[in-house]
Amino acid sequence: MTNVPETIRKRVDSLRATLEDHNYYYYVQDDPRIPDAEYDRLFRELQKLEAEHPELATEDSPTRRVGSSAETSFEEVIHRLPMLSLDNAFSEDELRDFDRRVRDRLGADGAIEYVCEPKLDGLAVSLHYENGTLTRAATRGDGYTGEDITANIRTIPSVPLKLRGSGYPDLVEVRGEVYMPRAGFEKLNERLAEQGEKTFVNPRNAAAGSLRQKKSTVTARRPLELCAYSMAVTDESVLPETHWDSLQLVRDWGFRINPEMRKAEGVEACLDAYNELMAKRDSLPYEIDGIVFKVNRLDLQQELGFVSRAPRWAIAHKFPAQEELTIIEDVEFQVGRTGAVTPVARLKPVFVGGVTVSNATLHNMDEIRRLDVHIGDTVFIRRAGDVIPQVVKVVPEKRPAEAPMVEMPEHCPVCGSDIVQIEGEAVARCSGGLYCPAQRKEAIRHYASRKAMDIEGLGDRLIEVLVDEGMVSTVADLYRLTKFQIASLERMGDKSAANLIAAIDRSREPVLWRFLYALGIREVGEATAKGLAAHFGTLEAISAADEETLQTVPDVGPIVAGHIRSFFDQPHNQETLAALKEAGVTWQEEQVLSADEQPLNGQTWVLTGTLSGMTRDQAKEKLEQLGAKVAGSVSKKTACVVAGEAAGSKLAKAEQLGVPVLDEEGLANLLREHGIEV
């Protein structure tokens, strides 16, 4: 052994202790004490020192958590104490029977105290420590023989490589569940999908697959955690009197124990714990499939003993399954209120997640292709809480011969309009926006909104009633409504009806860009609508333009041009436009000005304060007619600030930067000078 300076030895020991402390606070206590960058700096320093002085490297060093590229053989391990499974209870009656058996066997008249632990949906493991250092880790296997996974377990940050504190026995075994949190599972699957690799069906499979990687470097990159649930020692004199206290001891040694764990006196309290945990099941950051009840006193556990392959002093009360197998009998396509066309699997009814499920979403055609779904397939269905049931995996070996593939229809199943899918988008959509009954309410809501036709008093609830009562089918029908019809509706009197009819009448002569925006063409917002109106001047010119011509308008690319062209190509939409004209809706043509003819072209203006003669939106609209871009903040590039009453920080900043300022009268004069009505 070479002579390593004592200062180096002490620094290595100090770094190891510091890093393990921070691992403990970060991964076990969820209480980070230093920034990630500082942890990384200390970690790299330890790596460097161990590389320079290999004789200082130890098996319990934090640097061992990064894993090794050497392949693991998973040698057989015989458990000194069998890792027995638990009996299950699937109903309240079965749990009551368990409690009765416990009390009868113990001859107990009163209630038994139990420890209630969430049953994590992961992989059970056994960890052996000698003199406080992790020496071996193994899977449960068949309960008597498991596999050596020591190299992979070392990579899990919440597993102590060396026990904390002092006073622990020379030999100790800690058992726990390795699991993958929901957030980590989702990120892992996203990464695997991006790399073109096979994704995991659920977090449990992901945890099991990650723990059995032949190269521990792969395991090190997987977001695994460990939660301890029991301990065993050769010298039982060091054990506390209860299971609860033994877990507190395990926690003091540096392990994470479940914060949802609690004590319960008697079976009724156990049932309360079960119901409370089931209610919050879907909000937990990890998946659980039940709750484990254990007799708390260790002497009573010993008296109760074991039967066959399970202890008499514990039982797992399982939650309703969240995944089940069933068969896809058909696939139908639904149209949402925004026109999204979604494939829905019609299933052979199956009880899952506490309810009978006969439908499940397939999301889109990309997902159907990824899963390789055929009609007649046997599939795994998953339902968690209020989440819509979904197909998560196909069992291809059970596929019937000549099972048909799922194909996207060419026409909307509701209105018959073309179904379009823009390249690069996962969602296909019905192009019959103004006409399609499935999109009716959303189309009317958008048409009446303040930034579109601004029909005051026509809110969501009234739109629901008008459509549901059959009084309105398209936006054109709004202009055929009468005061009598409106007044006859619940909670609508004569005055409200008169006000609404007046608001509808006021919307008959919109400026072109507002009408264009009101049509609800996909991805045509206010700015794009203004650009189209200014460029073409008339709705007829816009509706006749091909995609190439449409793309000459600023901010209109191939995708938006495709949406515009698709909208005007649909006969149903043209019929609705004709009906609007017939109902007396006319839109003002815009004077088409070249950039040179727009006096404020290329300038950025800012509005601040209160204007008395017009609203801020009206002022913005008039400035945009002159070619200005109206921004929300002042900078050196601002051409001018219009300051109304009670102008605040924007005015102060303009004065500080030397930006010209106009009052409301100055703005009015500017607009009149260029022929804009004030």
Curated annotation (Swiss-Prot):
Sequence positions that bind Zn(2+): 412, 415, 430, 436
Describe its function. DNA ligase that catalyzes the formation of phosphodiester linkages between 5'-phosphoryl and 3'-hydroxyl groups in double-stranded DNA using NAD as a coenzyme and as the energy source for the reaction. It is essential for DNA replication and repair of damaged DNA.
Record keywords, A-Z: DNA damage, DNA repair, DNA replication, Ligase, Magnesium, Manganese, Metal-binding, NAD, Zinc
Protein source organism? Marinobacter nauticus (strain ATCC 700491 / DSM 11845 / VT8)
Q: Which GO terms describe its biological process?
A: DNA repair; DNA replication
Its protein name is DNA ligase
Q: What InterPro entries would the database entry show? A: BRCT_dom, BRCT_dom_sf, DisA/LigA_HHH, DNA_ligase, DNA_ligase_AS, DNA_ligase_CS, DNAligase_adenylation, DNAligase_N
Q: Where on this chain does NAD(+) bind? A: 36-40, 85-86, 117, 140, 177, 294, 318
**Would you name any one GO CC term?**
cytosol
What is the superkingdom listed in this entry's lineage? Answer: Bacteria
Active site per database record: 119
Any one Gene Ontology MF annotation carried by this entry is:
DNA binding
Q: Which family does it belong to?
A: Belongs to the NAD-dependent DNA ligase family. LigA subfamily.
Extract the SMART domains matched here: BRCT, HhH1, LIGANc
User: Which gene holds the coding sequence for this protein?
Assistant: ligA
Q: Enzyme class, one word? A: ligase
